[in-house]
Amino acid sequence: MRINVIATLALMFASPVAITAESSSYELTIKNHRFEPQQITVPADKKIKLMVTNQDSTPEEFESYELNREKIIPGGKKAVIYFGPLKPGKYPFFGEFHQETAKGVIIAE
């Protein structure tokens, strides 16, 4: 009986942690002052890990007012940006240093 109670309590407390720790990973590349891909579709209500690789020799800043995120990625370097869970919708982002070409959108479905 005592083992059953302990096992039940362990499962009750372990399950929410395992669920909230899950995240989906996506890759974004900066090349020729553009984001590739320009559109990323992600699941709604999940934490997102965005791995950004800057293949340009100059820095770029990933910025999104809707995601409340900004991150400078030096030329030739990588960065990881976490956000979410997101409600269904569109979340535009842009490159602060090259706004005319570095644009994209994350779509949560």
Model-derived features with residue positions:
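Positively charged n-region of N-terminal signal peptides that target proteins for export
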Residues: 1-5
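Extracellular/periplasmic metallocenter environments
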Residues: 21-27, 34, 74-109
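Structural beta-strand segments of beta-rich domains
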Residues: 38, 46-50
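Asparagine-centered strand-capping/turn motif at beta-strand->loop junctions
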Residues: 52-54
